[in-house]
């Protein structure tokens, strides 16, 4: 997966390198996570942007009230319907992706009966993974780039010492969490 992630990053970033100005969040930060998650899950490449748009709208909130944005509910329904269609395809024609693995997963319930995950369970999980995973990663990318643009010495240190990247990501997640509308409780 790492090789595919690197190739996807290069595919999205290479066209931007010769340009004097570009919107890194719109042209990379928002697209990259869905490309990776979409490939892992098994979304057709041509449908990933559409799913991302539905997800963005489904998760969007009014910053003043916290209420869902207009069209958010409908977008969430479209996203789930899309996932359900892919799941039905994978049950008929399995492929090498997470959707197929979940479609074929068996487990033993408390009565000892072997069961499969229900469509609702698979659709719910994949929709959550696609929406929440892409949103938080996109926001992390944006937050990190803004922070590092304001801290040139730190940016240079990370550039010079790439082994610090995992630690820097963890610290950026802690310092400027991508999910701002979730309550958190500090504990000892």
Where are the regions a protein language model picked out?
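Cytochrome P450
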Residues: 1-188
């Amino acid at each position: 997966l790492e090789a595919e992630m690197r190739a996807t990053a290069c595919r999205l970033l290479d066209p931007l390198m010769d340009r004097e100005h570009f919107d890194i969040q719109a042209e990379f930060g928002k697209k990259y996570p869905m490309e990776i998650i979409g490939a892992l899950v098994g979304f057709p490449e041509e449908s990933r942007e559409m799913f991302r748009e539905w997800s963005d709208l489904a998760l969007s909130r009014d910053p003043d009230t916290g209420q869902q944005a207009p069209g958010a509910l409908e977008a969430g329904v479209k996203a789930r319907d899309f996932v359900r269609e892919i799941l039905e395809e994978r049950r008929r024609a399995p492929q090498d992706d997470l959707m197929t693995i979940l479609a074929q997963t068996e487990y033993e319930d408390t009565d000892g009966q072997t069961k499969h995950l229900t469509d609702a369970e698979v659709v719910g999980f994949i929709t959550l993974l696609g929406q929440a995973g892409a949103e938080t990663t996109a926001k992390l990318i944006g937050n990190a780039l803004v922070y590092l643009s304001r801290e040139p010495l730190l940016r240079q240190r990370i550039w010079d010492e790439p082994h610090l990247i995992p630690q820097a990501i963890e610290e950026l997640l802690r310092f400027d969490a991508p999910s701002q509308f979730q309550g958190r409780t500090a504990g000892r």
